[in-house]
């Protein structure tokens, strides 16, 4: 992220990345911090209060504009609610906590942007859905994308970005390492050179 950049933090959570991006983008840049969970958004708002170039976007991103059920099942496993453990409960599974959020299409929410330089996406397994829906923005702006992905959706994410002309890498002690099939770290995608 460079001064003047426009960025989207999808799954902003408490704002760790959003604050850093805000500082790097500077007053000429902006960061849209997407966080659908109201109690987490309160903390996010406090954490971003000195970031004049940050805007909190109170939605879950997806393929439709509608109310959705989100859930958090971390208390059952760990004894406390993990703030980064919320997921779209489109399968109706039982969870320790459920709440309603508003889903919006990212391609519509951010469709009028004049530029998009960086996207961070960490949304508990919903990354494939959201990145496919935001494909028009990825094709138009070709932003660098940092994506947390693991398990079953990782090959789908890699295939999507490869098809779009991106190359993937991971970080190892501050150095970029080309993406391999056995890599499990978060992926940075940049347009291939």
Pin down the residues of each PLM region.
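Phosphate/nucleotide-binding beta-alpha loop and adjacent structural elements of enzyme active sites
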Residues: 1-193
